[in-house]
């Protein structure tokens, strides 16, 4: 298609989007990333000094650079209304409006939308005081699920049997409001849908691992690893989620006067009572994006532009390779509770020489990078990922 593309963001997710665009036919010279990071800057041009939540600064950059498609990576610019501002300048934007992005920005708003749309989800209670949190915890019982009712960089949720830890977490985020929810047990699935506000297109399912340590131990994080596809899913799973979750949600937002144009991330759990929605995100998930887009064959530029311009119904379904993709996140020590000092990463070139491996660079602290590996089966892909990781020191 050969259009000028702006990607907002600076993490491994945005690096994965860049790599997928290039892999599926976009020229690197047509991509600009703001602010980007050192790894992304090795592949495409970056505008490192931009505050991507500043609507005026982003508008100015887009107009100066002749941007035809803007892709918004993280949640903060969406909630700040950057997509609305860019659209007002005539730029096609893949990313929902400020109002529609409240699907992620406010857990209580998401619950209201799901209730109105008849989307299956867990029981929840909105709490404004610690006394209300305590009462809700008592009513629902352990394990306790306590969620910040706002953006918290993937760290706003605690699931624990320890009531003191749950209350401490609630106290930390009580200024946002708190949701206490019933605990749901089962396998979790992340399923992305492209949406143009009228129709949706599913991508391939993935599963991510949110706990900080091995064997699903430790605190929740933004995500420590993921894999795709999920061969254990029921045959009609994707169609079922499209019919019972994605389309009703999109239609309800349209009814509210806030058409959702962008990426609807459905965080799902398969319980013994059926499928339930745990959460929605209003953008590509990190680290699931790294494995989903690694397997994409269809030109990503075309898919996102059709979604951004309201023509998704004219697009053929996204196609994916049969390979398995695995990503493992390398994080600095102390993550997510504390930040280690910035240190030089060594061994990247050696890791990149491992067959079937790519590195997506994240931030200088916290989730530093994602090693993405593909293989004919899960074992082969996983082995390649850890072989590459063994060559990296932080």
Question: How would you describe each model-predicted region?
Answer:
Residues 1-98:
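ATP-binding N-terminal substructure of ATP-dependent carboxylate-amine bond-forming enzymes
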Residues 156-293:
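Internal nucleotide-binding/catalytic subdomain
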Residues 94-156:
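A conserved helix-loop-beta module that forms one wall/lid of the active-site cleft
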Residues 242-264, 281-356, 360-362:
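Active-site "cap" helix and flanking loop/linker of ATP-utilizing ligase/carboxylase catalytic domains
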């Amino acid at each position: 298609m050969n259009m000028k593309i702006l990607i907002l963001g600076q993490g491994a997710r945005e690096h994965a989007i860049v790599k997928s665009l290039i892999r599926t036919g976009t020229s690197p010279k047509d991509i600009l990333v703001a602010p980007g990071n050192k790894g992304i800057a090795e592949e495409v041009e970056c505008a490192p000094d931009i505050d991507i939540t500043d609507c005026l600064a982003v508008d100015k950059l887009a107009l100066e650079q002749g941007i035809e498609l803007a892709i918004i990576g993280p949640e903060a610019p969406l909630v700040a209304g950057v997509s609305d501002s860019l659209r007002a300048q005539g730029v096609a934007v893949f990313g929902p409006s400020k109002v529609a992005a409240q699907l992620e920005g406010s857990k209580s708003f998401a619950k209201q939308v799901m209730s109105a749309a008849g989307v299956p989800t867990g029981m929840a209670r909105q709490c404004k005081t610690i006394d209300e949190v305590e009462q809700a915890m008592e009513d629902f019982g352990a394990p306790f699920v306590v969620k910040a009712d706002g953006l918290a960089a993937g760290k706003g949720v605690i699931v624990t049997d320890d009531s003191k830890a749950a209350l401490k977490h609630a106290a930390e985020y009580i200024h946002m409001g708190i949701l206490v929810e019933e605990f749901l047990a089962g396998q979790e699935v992340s399923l992305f849908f492209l949406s143009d506000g009228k129709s949706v297109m599913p991508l391939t399912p993935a599963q991510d691992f949110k706990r900080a340590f091995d064997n699903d131990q430790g605190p929740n994080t933004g995500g420590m690893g993921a894999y795709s596809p999920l061969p254990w899913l029921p045959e009609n799973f994707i169609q079922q989620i499209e019919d019972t979750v994605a389309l009703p949600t999109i239609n309800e937002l349209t009814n509210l006067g806030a058409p959702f144009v962008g990426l609807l991330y459905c965080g799902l759990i398969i319980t013994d009572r059926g499928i339930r929605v745990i959460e929605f995100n209003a953008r590509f998930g990190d680290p699931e994006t790294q494995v989903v887009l690694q397997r994409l064959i269809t030109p990503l530029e075309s898919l996102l532009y059709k979604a951004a311009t309201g023509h998704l119904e004219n697009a053929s379904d996204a196609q994916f390779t049969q390979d398995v993709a695995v990503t493992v996140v390398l994080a600095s020590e102390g993550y997510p509770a504390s930040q280690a000092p910035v240190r030089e990463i060594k061994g990247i070139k050696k890791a990149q020489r491992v067959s079937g491996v790519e590195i997506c660079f994240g931030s200088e602290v916290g989730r530093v990078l994602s090693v993405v590996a593909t293989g004919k089966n899960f074992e082969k892909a996983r082995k390649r990922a850890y072989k590459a990781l063994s060559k990296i020191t932080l």
